């Protein structure tokens, strides 16, 4: 998952640059063996922008473009999608939040300072590894995703645990 920019930043990217970005980032994720790559806004921003959710298959990687910059809103919408006879538990909530992806993200690349967590993420922060890149949304390149994947590969996953030195 890559999280960055406001909805206004996303709109400013333009359709052609979006197509190129999805294709190129999808190729990197596909080469790394990822089944899914989700692109999500860091936050909604101050100006309302109406952008649509969309998806594309790039090789074996399903790329999801999710403009929801408010994690609480996304959580509420996921809860509304649950069937009335369905139990509300960690598994059903996770399934509703991640769909069409079939699992939680292993890696979240956050574009921005490491001192601020994205409000677009609520649920994902529990077990995903975060890699911060202090850059703006429009600066993101496939090489940045390659570097984040390499950083992730070097880590020892703690699944929400703390360093031994803490």
Segments and roles (model prediction):
Residues 1-166:
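Flexible, compositionally biased loop and terminal segments
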């Amino acid at each position: 998952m890559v999280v960055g920019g406001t909805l206004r930043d996303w709109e400013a990217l333009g359709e052609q640059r979006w197509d190129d970005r999805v294709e190129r980032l999808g190729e990197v994720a596909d080469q790394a063996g990822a089944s899914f790559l989700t692109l999500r806004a860091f936050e909604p921003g101050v100006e309302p922008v109406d952008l649509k959710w969309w998806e594309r298959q790039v090789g074996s990687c399903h790329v999801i473009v999710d403009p929801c910059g408010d994690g609480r809103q996304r959580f509420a919408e996921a809860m509304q999608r649950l069937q009335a006879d369905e139990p509300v538990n960690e598994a059903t909530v996770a399934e509703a939040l991640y769909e069409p992806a079939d699992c939680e993200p292993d890696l979240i690349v956050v574009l921005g300072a490491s001192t601020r967590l994205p409000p677009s993420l609520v649920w994902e922060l529990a077990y995903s590894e975060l890699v911060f890149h202090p850059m703006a949304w429009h600066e993101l390149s496939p090489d940045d995703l390659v570097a984040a994947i390499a950083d992730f590969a070097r880590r020892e996953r703690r699944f929400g645990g703390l360093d031994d030195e803490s």
